[in-house]
Amino acid sequence: MVAAASTYMIDGKQYVSIAVGWGGVFGLSQRVTELQSPGTVYTFAIDGKAQPPAFVKYQTEELLQGVKYDPKDVPEGTAIYVAACATCHGVPGVDKGGNVRNLGYVSAETIANLKDFVFKGPFRDQGMPDFTGKLRDEDVVKIQAFIQGTADAIRPKN
């Protein structure tokens, strides 16, 4: 539950509504189950018989690999990522992400083209900030280095 339940009556029938899912700040970058649970309001009728919908499993990519970067960019990329990205995207590859994808589990193509998402990108209508005027192209290159460098650092060695 992400909020208190509410109960009410309509035409003599009692209902209970509950907001559920991994919403709020925690749910942006974290999850505690392999099931996808977008923010939903469930309403139950007392003595109702309907079944809830089935949850689906999260679809994740493998741990990121293949993005070229200069290891010297990782330290500054870390600071920029923590300031601009970590609140929503979490630590790359350390967890599987929440309602917002963990960038350690996206395609190499996505990270290689990161500035297309950071500057006037396609997810602005879903809450992704536009970092135009706040970050520079060089900052994005350093963020890419941090993301791929972190994925490389945590990748299990065979």
Each model region followed by its residue ranges:
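Short pre-active-site segment immediately N-terminal to redox-active cysteine/selenocysteine motifs
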Residues: 73-76, 81-87, 92, 107-110, ...
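Gly/Gly-Pro-rich "capping" loops immediately C-terminal to redox-active cysteine motifs
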Residues: 5, 90-120
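Conserved blade-ending motifs and adjacent loop-strand segments that build the rim/top face
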Residues: 1-12, 23
